[in-house]
C-alpha cells in the first residue's frame, strides 16, 4: 500500500528496474513483504485456459519483474513464491485470476496466474515472475509496455472485494512510525500495520473498517504524505 535462478555458457543475470525506462538502473526494486494471509494448498503449475474464455478486463501499462529477496516467501494468496513458475503480482485483480499478458512491442504473449500484490513502484501495473519475464523479453530490459487481459477470475473484478491502503517505502522507520501514530488517532476504526520489505524500507498498510473500497479511496484522498500511496485488494 508502496523488490534471481545447464547451459553452455553462464547466463548474465540482469537486475529488475526501478523506473519504467528503456535502460533501467542496475538495482532491484523495493517491494513490501507479501500479505500474511492463511496458508492455502499449492495449486498445479499447469495453467488451463478454457477454449471459450472471454476477456473480462483489459489494461495497458508498464510491467517489471521481481524475484530477488522473495524466493520461497509466502505470496499474498498463501502460496510459496517460486521465480520459475508462471505467476505475477497485480494490485487489484482478484488473487488466482488467470491473465494473458502481451508485450506490446514484441507481441510475445504468456498466460500467468495472479498470486501476489504489487508492484509498488510509480505507474507500473504488473510484476512478473522471472520465468514469465523471460518469455516476454522483460527479463533482459527490466520493464516493458504490456497489455493485460483477464480470462478467468474467482471473484468479480468491479464489485466487492476486501481493500486496504498501502503507503511507502519509508527509508527512515521513524517517519513510518510517526505517520502510523497519526493515522491511528485520526481513523480509530482502522488498523494500521507497519512492516519492512526484504529489499529495505518500511511500509504502512491501513486496513479500513469492513475492508470497504470507498473508505480506502477516501483515506488516500485525505492523507497527505510524501510517500507513495496505493489502493490494494486483499483477496
What kind of region is each of these model predictions?
Residues 1-178, 195, 221-222, 233-235:
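Secreted/periplasmic proteins
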Residues 171-235:
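Extracytoplasmic
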Amino acid at each position: 500500500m508502496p523488490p534471481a535462478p545447464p547451459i553452455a555458457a553462464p547466463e548474465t543475470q540482469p537486475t529488475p528496474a526501478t523506473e519504467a525506462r528503456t535502460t533501467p538502473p542496475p538495482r532491484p526494486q523495493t517491494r513490501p513483504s507479501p500479505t500474511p494471509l492463511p496458508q492455502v494448498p499449492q495449486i498445479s503449475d499447469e495453467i488451463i485456459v478454457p477454449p471459450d474464455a472471454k476477456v473480462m478486463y483489459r489494461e495497458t501499462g508498464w510491467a517489471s519483474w521481481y524475484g530477488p529477496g522473495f524466493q520461497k516467501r509466502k505470496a499474498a494468496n498463501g502460496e510459496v513464491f517460486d521465480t520459475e513458475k508462471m505467476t505475477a503480482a497485480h494490485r487489484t485483480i482478484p488473487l488466482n485470476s488467470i491473465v494473458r499478458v502481451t508485450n506490446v512491442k514484441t507481441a510475445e504473449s504468456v498466460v500467468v496466474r495472479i498470486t501476489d500484490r504489487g508492484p509498488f513502484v510509480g505507474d507500473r501495473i504488473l510484476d512478473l515472475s522471472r520465468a514469465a519475464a523471460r518469455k516476454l523479453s522483460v527479463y533482459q530490459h527490466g520493464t516493458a509496455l504490456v497489455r493485460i487481459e483477464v480470462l478467468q477470475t474467482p471473484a468479480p473484478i468491479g464489485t466487492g472485494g476486501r481493500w486496504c491502503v498501502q503507503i511507502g517505502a519509508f527509508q527512515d522507520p521513524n517517519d513510518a512510525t510517526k505517520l502510523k501514530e497519526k493515522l491511528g488517532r485520526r481513523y480509530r476504526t482502522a488498523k494500521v500495520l507497519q512492516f519492512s520489505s526484504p529489499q529495505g524500507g518500511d511500509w504502512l498498510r491501513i486496513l479500513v473498517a469492513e475492508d470497504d473500497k470507498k473508505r480506502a479511496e477516501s483515506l488516500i484522498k485525505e492523507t497527505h504524505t510524501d510517500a507513495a500511496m496505493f489502493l490494494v485488494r486483499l483477496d
